Amino acid sequence: MESPFMDAEARVISLDPSARLHLAEPLAGGVSSHTRRLVFEAADGVHAVVERRPKAMPGKPPPVERATREAALLTRLPDLGIPAPRLRRFEPPDTLVLDFLEGEGDPPAGAPASVIGPMARLLVALHRLGPEHGLPPLPTFTDPLADLRTWRPDLFPADAVPGPACPPLAGPPRLLHGDFWMGNLLWRDGGLAGLLDWEDACLGDPMAELAAARCDLHSRFSADAAEALAWAYAALAPVDRARLSWWDFYMPTAQLTHMDGWGLPPDDLARVRTAMTERRDQSLAALGMG
């Protein structure tokens, strides 16, 4: 199969004319993008970078749009204390070259208890950021009902008076990573060392991202782990339980709508489908709509 990237030797020389390539290897686990790691030696030492090119994915904007957004963010986020990789180069239309972050994808010993606190702290740190922090223009994501009416028209009949309503967002939209799950986290020495894959970032309701992270903990560990994350978050920042209830319905519904296009192994797909069906049904009951 043809490589989605330029010649590895040419790439590292484009970054530093003194570079000598040591290693070029694809990185496993990327569902929404092609990725490879390059290690090279230059006059100032050894460097490691990652190349990324987004793939076309159901339910996501086009690859060029996602790559452009991620490139703009990654010139800013490391300076704001967020453990995101720094952009080395953006090569239009859709190729990013990023600093390689050291860390492990597997959670530390003692999970899920060992991951709840670090995840909550990172979420709260993200959600304190907004346009006033010099972020690039981003799409907004504040209303769960628009998509839900499309996905579940049976729950939103046109003649219903009044129809189901979600309380308005109380504050300004904040920075959301847009795909906050364990697969995008790196761990080192028991702590969070990196948050990867910023192509879906937006300004929106923090409760949407909290609900998404809760889905992942539910499917990976248990419903109790998902609830523990909400309590850990609430110890650091306000939790709007009324809006969280709607996002707790939205997120599993979105996953059930799109997961067949994710390319997951059959066993993983079955596990996530079972957990998200359970979570969707529980959230519907909590909203009084089940």
Each language-model region and where it sits:
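Glycine-rich, phosphate-binding/catalytic loops in enzymes
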Residues: S114-V115, G194, L210-A213, R273-T274
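Active-site-adjacent helix/loop segment of glycosyltransferases
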Residues: A242-W246
